């Protein structure tokens, strides 16, 4: 059996990044050398100082985008499966609410509505989680240790849980304010949803329809 040819998509992306960054760095060095000279006219010095500032911002953005791409690629499959699971739970919760609304008591209806809201927040959390960060799972495969062996491990678990609660609280407010930048119903119907910004980092994202596509786009970055 012939050996499969490894994909060069990742390396090609890295090559483009390295090439673009190298050009920007060269321009920065050239301008810095020019500005070190004593005989540069004032107007030319001002123009080049402005250009230097703009180039440094461009380089910083490019470096951040590259870092974000690497993190997003690492966790996009986890996010995909968690999105599917969250949507499945939401479908079940809405179906249960419909059934209870027809035959149940008021307290049962109220409880079912709370479950639906909880599931909607889960869906929004997965979709809007900042791609520049290590993804914090809603449904981890293993239970966290109750008694971590080291102080560092304990602090790490506490930090992760604190960040999860912080992000989920922000998503909860968006859901309650009906301010989500996408339609949950569209996701439930298997439609592609274009999210221009996540709720924290401002990075552009494209969220694929979970029922129809498995590969999530990674070219949403600034």
From Swiss-Prot:
Disordered, as annotated region: 140-166, 199-222
One Pfam family matching this protein: Efg1
UniProt feature coiled coil, ranges: 47-108, 149-180
InterPro entries assigned to the protein according to its UniProt record, in alphabetical order: Efg1, EFG1_rRNA-proc
Record's subcellular location: Nucleus, Nucleolus
The entry's keywords: Coiled coil, Nucleus, rRNA processing
Biased composition (Basic and acidic residues): 143-164, 199-215
Primary subcellular site in the record, as a coarse category: nucleus
Record's GO cellular component terms: nucleolus; preribosome, small subunit precursor
Entry's family note: Belongs to the EFG1 family.
Function: Involved in rRNA processing.
Protein name from the UniProt record: rRNA-processing protein EFG1
């Amino acid at each position: 059996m012939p050996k499969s040819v490894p994909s060069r998509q990742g390396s090609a992306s890295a090559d483009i990044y390295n090439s673009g960054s190298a050009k920007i760095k060269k321009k920065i060095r050239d301008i810095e050398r020019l500005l070190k000279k004593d005989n540069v006219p004032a107007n030319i010095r001002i123009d080049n100082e402005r250009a230097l500032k703009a180039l440094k911002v461009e380089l910083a953005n490019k470096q951040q985008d590259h870092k974000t791409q690497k993190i997003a690629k690492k966790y996009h499959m986890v996010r995909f499966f968690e999105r599917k699971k969250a949507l499945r739970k939401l479908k079940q919760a809405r179906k249960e609410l419909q059934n209870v609304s027809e035959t149940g008591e008021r307290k049962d209806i109220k409880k079912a509505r709370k479950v639906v809201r909880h599931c909607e927040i889960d869906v929004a959390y997965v979709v809007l989680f900042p791609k520049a960060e290590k993804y914090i799972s809603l449904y981890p495969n293993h239970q966290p240790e109750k008694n971590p062996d080291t102080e560092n491990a304990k602090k790490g678990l506490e930090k992760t849980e604190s960040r999860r609660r912080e992000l989920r609280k922000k998503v909860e407010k968006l859901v309650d304010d009906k301010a989500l930048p996408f339609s949950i119903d569209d996701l439930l119907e298997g439609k592609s949803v274009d999210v221009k910004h996540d709720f924290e980092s401002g990075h552009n994202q494209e969220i694929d329809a979970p029922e129809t596509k498995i590969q999530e786009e990674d070219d949403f970055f600034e």
